[in-house]
């Protein structure tokens, strides 16, 4: 697996997700890099379980991270196909509620928990990442598939 360097803001946010017991998976470019194809990415993609209990936890994590209370509603994290963006590339966080071709709970049961520095991070498994990339089907997803083991 590739060595991953995280921006301090990403570390802080991941620590908050863990401290609030948020059910999440790291997907996208960071997951591709972890699974063996390091490449440039402009953001960190975090897929969350879209449930009542998890929406309360993720909203609390966002507030603790500094998002104004009035801009973060728990219902925001219950919407299908929602993308919540924070920051500017290359230090942008994208929290998503849906991922193409895969089910969150199934993927969560297959997750790989990896320690980077002092942070335990939930990564989508290689098999589930490949399913997701295949279903998404964008040019960069196909390129990722060609380079993943």
Name every feature range the model reports, one short phrase each:
Residues 1-149:
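Compositionally biased terminal segments of proteins
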């Amino acid at each position: 697996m590739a060595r991953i360097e995280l921006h301090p803001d990403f570390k802080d946010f991941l620590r908050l997700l863990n401290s609030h017991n948020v059910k999440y998976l790291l997907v996208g470019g960071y997951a591709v890099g972890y699974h063996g194809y390091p490449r440039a990415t402009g953001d960190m993609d975090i897929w969350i379980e879209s449930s009542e209990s998890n929406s309360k936890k993720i909203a609390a994590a966002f507030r603790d991270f500094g998002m104004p209370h009035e801009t973060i509603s728990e219902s925001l994290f219950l919407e299908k196909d929602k993308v919540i963006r924070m920051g500017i590339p290359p230090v942008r966080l994208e929290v998503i509620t849906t991922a193409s071709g895969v089910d969150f709970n199934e993927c969560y049961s297959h997750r790989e928990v990896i320690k980077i520095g002092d942070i335990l991070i939930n990564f989508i498994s290689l098999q589930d990442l490949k399913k997701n990339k295949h279903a998404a089907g964008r040019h960069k997803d196909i390129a990722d598939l060609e380079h993943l083991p």
